[in-house]
Amino acid sequence: WIMGHMVNKIEQINEFLDLGANSIEVDITFDNLGYAEYTYHGFPCDCKRWCTNQENVKEYLNALSDITTPGNPKFRKELTLVVFDLKTGGIDANRMYEGGKDFAGKILFDYWKGSENAGRAYIIISVPSIDHYKFMKGFRERFDGSAFKDLLLEKDGWDFSGNDDLDATRTAYQNAGIEALNHIWQSDGITNCIPRGLGRVNKAVSNRDSPDAFINKVYVWTVEKYSSVKDALNADVDGIMTNHPNVINGVLKEDEFKDRFKLATYGDNPWTKFKR
């Protein structure tokens, strides 16, 4: 998966898809009560990126639904996976669970349109700290007893993006009521302004491939330097988050990688561990 980074304006969705992305990441900000407000990153952000692009969350989700609904004139088949990078740090601790429930409602009614026939992309609920596991718990439990629980079970995955200890991350999922290998993506990364080694990535990949795994997939962020892309692919990651999807596409076409990797399509399940 080539994951377009910080796609916070509606018009940027097609821009990143045109560059070769098959996945996007969008930042979501909240008020202190846990209500989602804007698609906004703010300062600091990646080098050579505009940090203040934003949309109203409802308007963005509606547009995203159009782009990922077959039969809609705006449909783009390339977009198969959306990462919601949830800026939960400003939510009051005692409102984290309710914030998760409220955002689940926005996904259900603004993105899925309260229907099984809209917004076909898979989604990842990405939270920046394992201390915020109650947000995931609230999101998941919003669907308990719901007619749309099957949508959650089919379409939704999880990620803690704060580079936390992997054993502690496993425990956080247990606290959230999410079982091992239940659609879990593990991210690792840092802003493109600063180099970062692959030590933790290698540990995550080892977990993914072990009999005692809790991780289904591994992705790195934010990567665009040619040598760093090659290093990430040689580490056997499943996804690369980038500001320059065209760079990743170019590397994938090289002799070293063209027979080892392919660009994921909608037919490739993002929750299934890939075995060579």
Curated annotation (Swiss-Prot):
Provide the catalytic activity annotation: an N-(acyl)-sphingosylphosphocholine = an N-(acyl)-sphingosyl-1,3-cyclic phosphate + choline; an N-(acyl)-sphingosylphosphoethanolamine = an N-(acyl)-sphingosyl-1,3-cyclic phosphate + ethanolamine; a 1-acyl-sn-glycero-3-phosphocholine = a 1-acyl-sn-glycero-2,3-cyclic phosphate + choline; a 1-acyl-sn-glycero-3-phosphoethanolamine = a 1-acyl-sn-glycero-2,3-cyclic phosphate + ethanolamine
Q: How is the cofactor bound?
A: Binds 1 Mg(2+) ion per subunit.
Xref: InterPro entries: PLC-like_Pdiesterase_TIM-brl
Enzyme class comes to lyase
Residues of the active site are: H5, H41
Which EC number(s) does UniProt give? 4.6.1.-
One term of GO molecular function: lyase activity
Q: Which GO terms describe its biological process?
A: killing of cells of another organism; lipid catabolic process
Q: Which family does it belong to?
A: Belongs to the arthropod phospholipase D family. Class II subfamily.
What is this protein called in UniProt? Dermonecrotic toxin LlSicTox-alphaIV1i
